[in-house]
Amino acid sequence: MSKPSVLKGCLESLVALEKTKRIPKKPSCDASPLISNFENWSGKPRKLYLRDARSMKRQGLPYELNSNMFAQLLASPMRLDKITRVRAPKELLVQIKLRKADTDISAARGKPFELRPSFGMERGHPTSYVSNSVALVHKYASSAMKWLPSSANSTIRHINQADVATQPEWYSQAYTEQMLGSLREALSSTLMHLGKAPESDPRDVIIVCNPQLPAISLRKSENPFIALATTVLNLYPIKDPELEKVVNNRDIELCSSKHRSLCFLIYRLLAFQADRII
């Protein structure tokens, strides 16, 4: 048999196979029962996953989590806490960056790199996370090298631990001052604009400076149709005269969704100093 006839026969066979190709049958269900009913056979509790906060209202669950400050904290992406080795929402942790050391530190210690906290959840530089607790950081300060970002030990970027300076003392000094400075500025700016325009959103957070109250508490809302409870954030345990002067013995009412960054900042500072407050 000649080559052209063999080639012709192969092409005819391929065409015949194409015509007789079976189309896969579409499953009767939209999602596999192994996914939709995972909790029934895995022994794990059911988890509720929603695409957006409004879907709860459509399903008859008016929890208003999109305007709940604590729900927003818990909804932040999960990260590994290098101290406790537990995954937690990153808004409840402190971001640590591996950076090139300042000139004076590099000259004094002979270490070209240092681990430093990042206040505003910055991008760039190798990153890790630790507990937002001054007590835990001081307790485990001797093992601070374990906080080194995993990417620092990759095959592309390998950094010797002997070249990294750790400064756990920043928790009680520079980092606290950085948070306090940002809080003073943010609170003063908010108060300047608070009364200039009418607030249409419900005010579900109250900032006070009261020695009689705990750092964080809940107060039953005067209007249950707007919010079941109001979160009270007490600045008194921080013991900062400038903040006390700004608050000036008054109750400052805020909307958590509108003043999200300020509410988060106060919560983080109170949680950071919680062991000292208690």
Curated annotation (Swiss-Prot):
Pfam families: RRG8. InterPro entries: Rrg8. It comes from Lachancea thermotolerans (strain ATCC 56472 / CBS 6340 / NRRL Y-8284). GO terms for cellular component: mitochondrion. Keywords: Mitochondrion. The gene is RRG8. Belongs to the RRG8 family. Required for respiratory activity and maintenance and expression of the mitochondrial genome. This is Required for respiratory growth protein 8, mitochondrial. It is found in: Mitochondrion. One of its GO terms (biological process) is mitochondrial genome maintenance. The keyword Isomerase does not apply.
